[in-house]
């Protein structure tokens, strides 16, 4: 195609992208001879979540464009496309030797490959590291938990639940509840209901065991819940009773954001002394 002919096709490609018609966009881009243009469109496609690209599509792109912008994002997404049914354990291990896992799921995929080769020491470290933060679908959660059952303990499930709660990934947290010890199940059920703005919050909080009533995460979720409903006095009640130290707060950055929002509301009400006290 000449430059004159390529221009309307490239415009057509962009139009397909804007409409999220990626199959048509990719076919359209293939008609353009300019390699840089085709590479750009492929890059845009591979960055979209839920695409139908295979691991091989990602692998080819990464190998040919190792200096491309946001290549680590592409590598991270590539990890989610690795499946033992399509790749041998050796090829997966070789890939990760050149491209160390960037996400929790990547570590789990590598652990799975090592498990096939009976290398349990490598499996244990990777699965414990990856389990906490991995982005796992509902179906994969059950699959991986069953597959790595002898390596994962209640403590590992608790670490994952705590991470998901602080990151406010409440649907993922809900799926984890059944794997937690009963007392922790009650704590994280209350947190999950608070952050997802679901019914039954008061009832769930009343069931939280006494030893967790002053849990930092629970207090944080209650604070946020009250603040979002404009309950400044109720929010203050929590802020004034908790320990304001890093060890207790767990995530001081999140607490600070809530404090600053509530402090602004107090300043607006001319309650300067109280605003000063909580900041």
Residue ranges and their predicted role:
Residues 2-7:
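Short, small-residue-biased leader/transition segments that mark boundaries at the very start
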Residues 8-21, 159-164, 221-226, 262-268:
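Alpha-helical segment of the N-proximal tetratricopeptide repeat
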Residues 12, 42-45, 78, 110, ...:
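Structural register within alpha-helical repeat arrays
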Residues 26-36, 47-50, 59-69, 81-83, ...:
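Solenoid-like repeat scaffolds
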């Amino acid at each position: 195609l000449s430059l004159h002919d390529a221009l309307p096709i490239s415009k057509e490609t962009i139009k397909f992208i804007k409409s999220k018609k990626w199959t048509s966009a990719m076919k359209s881009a293939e008609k353009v001879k300019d390699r840089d243009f085709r590479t750009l469109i492929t890059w845009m496609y591979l960055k979209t979540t839920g695409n139908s690209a295979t691991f091989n599509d990602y692998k080819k792109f990464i190998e040919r464009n190792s200096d491309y912008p946001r290549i680590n994002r592409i590598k991270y997404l590539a990890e989610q496309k690795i499946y033992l049914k399509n790749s041998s354990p050796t090829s997966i291990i070789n890939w990760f030797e050149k491209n160390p896992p960037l996400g929790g799921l990547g570590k789990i995929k590598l652990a799975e490959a090592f498990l096939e080769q009976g290398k349990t020491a490598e499996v244990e470290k990777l699965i414990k590291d990856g389990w906490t933060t991995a982005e796992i679908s509902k179906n994969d959660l059950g699959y991986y938990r069953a597959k790595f059952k002898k390596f994962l303990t209640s403590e590992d499930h608790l670490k994952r639940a705590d991470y998901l709660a602080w990151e406010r990934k409440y649907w993922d947290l809900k799926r984890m509840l059944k794997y937690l010890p009963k007392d922790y199940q009650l704590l994280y059920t209350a947190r999950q209901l608070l952050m997802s703005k679901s019914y039954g919050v008061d009832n769930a909080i009343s069931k939280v065991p006494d030893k967790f009533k002053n849990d930092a995460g629970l207090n944080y979720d209650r604070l946020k819940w009250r603040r979002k409903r404009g309950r400044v006095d109720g929010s203050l009640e929590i802020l004034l009773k908790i320990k304001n130290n890093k060890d207790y707060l767990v995530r001081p950055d999140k607490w600070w954001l809530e404090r600053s929002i509530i402090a602004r509301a107090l300043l607006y009400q001319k309650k300067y002394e109280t605003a000063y006290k909580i900041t």
